[in-house]
Amino acid sequence: MIGFIGFGRTGKAVATAILENKEFSLEWVYRRKTLLENRSIAEFLGIESDEIGKLYSSEHTAVEDLLDKQPVDFIIDFSSSTGIYSYGKAAASRGVKIISAISHYAKEDIAFMKTLAKDTTVFWSPNITLGVNFLLLASKSLKKIAP
């Protein structure tokens, strides 16, 4: 079970790939915008899926409440370098693993993530977005080749 923080271009592409894969479940997307809040992620992306995950806004839903009511195993962060501060402690205290797709962090942000890593797994690579984009492009190409 996966939760997303942020929902930009790369996040939407990865969400689409997850929704199309029956082995994973995208439970929710948590973002600042209130536009289309509580709508189906699949509907928002315009794809067919049996997944019931929804969009939530930080303006109306506390991340602690979301993690308690709809627990996930992983959070994939597509927000910004400061996004980790909005959910990091809540996720770590619940043992939720954090995967950051943020390209650059300041030294103090990295130190904060190391603190979180004492309670949960925190994965971050400065080039993860480049890698994710490559994998998405490769998977699209393979779909065209494979029957």
Residues covered by each model-derived region:
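Glycine-rich Rossmann-fold phosphate-binding loop(s) that bind the pyrophosphate
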Residues: F7
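N-terminal Rossmann-fold NAD(P) dinucleotide-binding loop
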Residues: G11-K12
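NAD(P)-binding Rossmann-fold cofactor-contacting core
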Residues: E20-E51
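Glycine-rich, highly charged phosphate/nucleotide-binding loops
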Residues: G46-D68, I76-T82
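Short acidic/histidine-rich motifs immediately flanking catalytic phosphotransfer sites
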Residues: D68-I75, A92-I98
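Rossmann-fold NAD(P)-binding glycine/threonine-rich loop
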Residues: T82-R94, A101-L142
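Internal alpha-helical scaffold of NAD(P)-dependent oxidoreductase catalytic cores
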Residues: K143-P147
